[in-house]
A protein has these predicted regions:
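N-terminal beta-alpha lobe that positions the nucleotide/phosphoryl donor
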Residues: 1-137, 146, 223-248, 259, ...
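Conserved catalytic alpha/beta cores of large enzymes that bind or transform nucleotide phosphates
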Residues: 167-252, 257-258, 285-302
Length: 302
């Protein structure tokens, strides 16, 4: 059996299914809303897609509903170590629909292990040999009215007293593609107070379409409007504290709020690459980290 429900996974399963899938299982077990789905173990990559692996993927996908749209996301083994993170180096695909398309997206996730981006990154780390083993996480898509990422510390300085939230309309694809700049918020981790708001001009969003995510113009009255209300920021801050408490350290969290106003977490991983002793000029920018976390392709690409 090559697949397991995400809800059944725990941290100990990271060695077989990858950190992303194991983390989603941990979040579910802690009572935090996570879209349901299944994980494909890393060993499946060594088997032909035409045989039992495909049968397992199709059966697990069909158990989620009648051809539901899903996210197909790489979940490499050891991808978020203390020394380095592979976030954004391997491909993930959004709004994939149909068993054939899901299987193809899984193959594309595996193929990204040998892509130029991932290979170059491994070379910079001095580990250009055999790529890491990779599982795959498949989750029901959230029809996001707004989505974003948040860090339970300052992602540049490492300051543990604040929560950094970035948000944009719809799916996160416009941010990944550099088409819009997200709104930025800073919250006090202690009091929940909003310490800073920077509202950006968000003229584009990606929403569901018949064949995948569709790029749309944002109505004029929302272009320069804040994505998040105070109550939503409060909910995000409380959730961030819960997640950090569960995992025992600063977290980089991807989230979405659906069109009914319900908050879902899409992944959580340790914050890496922050050098507390260095100035901001020596660290990666917050936007670099946001783009890494959001990294995914539209369903059409799969």
């Amino acid at each position: 059996m090559y697949t397991r429900p995400l809800a059944d996974l725990r941290s100990a399963d990271a060695a077989g299914f990858g950190g992303k899938s194991a983390s989603l299982g941990e979040l579910t077990a802690s009572g935090i809303p996570v879209p349901p789905g299944f994980a494909l173990q890393a060993d499946a990559r060594a088997e032909p897609m035409s045989g039992t692996v495909r049968e397992a993927i199709v059966a697990a996908y069909q158990a989620l509903g009648d051809d539901p749209p899903v996210a197909v996301r790489s979940s490499a083994i050891g991808e978020d170590s203390a020394e380095a993170t592979f976030a954004g180096q391997h491909e993930s695909y959004l709004w994939v629909r149909g068993a054939d398309a899901v299987c193809e997206a899984v193959r594309d996730c595996w193929a990204s292990l040998h892509g130029e981006r991932a290979t170059s990154y491994r070379e910079r780390l001095g580990s250009a040999g055999e790529p890491p083993a990779m599982g795959v996480a498949v989750q029901l898509m959230v029809d996001a009215a707004v989505s974003g990422v948040m860090f339970t510390c300052n992602p540049v300085s490492g300051d543990p007293s604040t929560i950094a939230v970035n948000a944009s309309w719809g799916l996160g694809l416009a941010v990944v593609g550099g088409e819009v700049t997200p709104d930025e918020y800073r919250l006090s981790k202690v009091t929940g107070e909003v310490l800073q708001r920077t509202v950006a001009r968000k003229h584009l969003e990606y929403t569901p379409g018949p064949e995948g995510a569709v790029r749309r113009d944002v109505p004029d009255d929302r272009i320069e409007a804040p994505c998040l209300e105070d109550a939503q920021l409060a909910a995000l801050g409380e959730t961030a504290r819960r997640v950090e408490g569960h995992f025992g350290g600063p977290q980089d969290i991807e989230w979405a709020i659906d069109r009914d106003g319900e908050l879902f977490l899409l992944q959580s991983r340790p914050v890496t690459g922050v050098r507390k002793e260095s100035g901001a000029s020596e660290s990666r920018s917050a936007m670099d980290l946001v783009m890494d976390t959001f990294g995914a392709r539209r369903g059409e690409s799969s």
